């Protein structure tokens, strides 16, 4: 990984690409050196490249944007090809930042050059589905690779218990950081899973009364599940990238690359914890499966700093209130989630609406009141400060 590095900033200068360099190096070590390895898909076009990141976010990088990135980055080193690949990764990051911030590429690139937090650098490279918080003992373990924050918007690559940054090495002592989830091997007796209640991409016949919330604290997850079903269809195979089934349970790969294993006993536990009501048994079954997958991911990510203790604890963290957007992310849909407004949802755009008290599905200008659709216009939601989200 000595083929390239980020040049150190000068005194008084606001310039720092150490976080991006550290993340790119970790991706090279984990997935391979080529952008085609580090991203899900890279397709050359007449004017540049179409890029799909591992979380599903899509950007188009022009030759001119790549050239401007190369001129501005100050990546240095002996490996010209590695530097060129790092430039490509940085350009894609900046293009995503421009798309998410609704700004021009040059403005996004300028902002990028000023530095980035470790988490934002990882997220912007499409790694949200692979992120695992690493405590010092895991981050400093032999034969392990990670990244850690060193100062404000600076980061360092961690290899074999040492952080590498600014041409220096230092041992991991009390540092926390991030590592990428290991591959989960395919079970030899696995087969494609089947969910017979509805064909792939077909929306629920009655999203209101077919399944609705019965547990007071799990509204964020319930509204996210309903929103996903109204966007991609009721069948989990339309929401996730792929699902296989074996005698031991299910292996689920989400759209952002996160893979979880779910046992039959865990699925039963999720059914009890979800406490779903409704008139459509098949719809409830599919919603329970999504709920269980969300809880399993919460366990792997140690949601609320306690879900890692076990699946039962992870289920509890889904039932005690959450931050809007967390549940959509745990379904693998972070890259497809966008900010909206209560006015946009009231006009008919589907999504979720949340405040400090509750989170609801909104479809066709109506919000979900525990299984009953009610007109959003004129409701208390129009006058309360809330967070509106939509899927694209």
PLM-predicted stretches and their roles:
Residues 16, 57-163, 211-212, 217, ...:
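Predominantly the structural core of cysteine protease catalytic domains
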């Amino acid at each position: 990984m000595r083929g390239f590095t980020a040049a150190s900033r000068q005194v008084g200068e606001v310039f720092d690409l150490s976080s991006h360099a550290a993340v790119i190096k970790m991706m090279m070590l984990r997935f391979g050196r080529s952008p085609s390895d580090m991203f899900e898909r890279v397709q050359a076009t007449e004017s540049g490249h179409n890029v799909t990141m591992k979380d599903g976010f899509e950007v188009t990088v022009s030759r001119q944007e790549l050239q401007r990135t190369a001129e501005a980055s100050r990546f240095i080193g002996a490996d010209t090809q590695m530097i060129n690949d790092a430039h490509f990764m940085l350009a894609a990051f900046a293009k995503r930042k421009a798309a998410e911030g609704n700004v021009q590429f040059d403005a996004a690139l300028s902002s990028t050059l000023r530095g980035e937090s470790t988490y934002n650098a990882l997220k912007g490279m499409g790694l949200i589905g692979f992120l695992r918080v690493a405590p010092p003992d895991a981050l400093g373990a032999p034969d392990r690779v990670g990244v850690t924050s060193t100062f404000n918007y600076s980061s360092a690559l961690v290899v074999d218990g040492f952080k590498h940054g600014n041409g220096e090495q230092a041992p991991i002592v009390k540092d926390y950081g991030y590592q990428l989830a290991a591959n989960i091997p395919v079970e030899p007796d696995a087969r494609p899973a089947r969910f017979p209640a509805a064909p792939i991409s077909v929306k629920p016949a009655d999203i209101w009364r077919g399944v609705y919330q019965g547990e007071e604290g799990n509204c964020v997850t319930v509204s996210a599940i309903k929103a996903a079903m109204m966007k991609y269809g009721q069948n989990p195979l339309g929401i996730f990238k792929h699902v296989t089934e074996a005698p031991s349970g299910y292996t689920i790969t989400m759209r952002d690359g996160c893979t979880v294993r779910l046992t039959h006993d865990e699925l039963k536990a999720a059914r009890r914890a979800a406490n779903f009501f409704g008139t459509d048994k098949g719809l409830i079954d599919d919603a329970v499966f999504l709920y269980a997958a969300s809880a399993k991911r919460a366990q792997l990510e140690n949601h609320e700093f306690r879900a890692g203790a076990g699946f039962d604890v992870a289920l509890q963290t889904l039932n005690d209130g959450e931050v809007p957007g967390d549940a959509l992310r745990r379904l693998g849909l972070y890259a497809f989630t966008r900010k909206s407004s209560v006015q946009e949802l009231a006009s008919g755009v589907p999504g979720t609406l949340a405040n400090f008290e509750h989170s609801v599905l909104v479809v066709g200008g109506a919000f979900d009141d525990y299984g009953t659709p009610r007109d959003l216009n004129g409701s208390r939601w129009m006058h309360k400060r809330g967070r509106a989200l939509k899927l694209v």
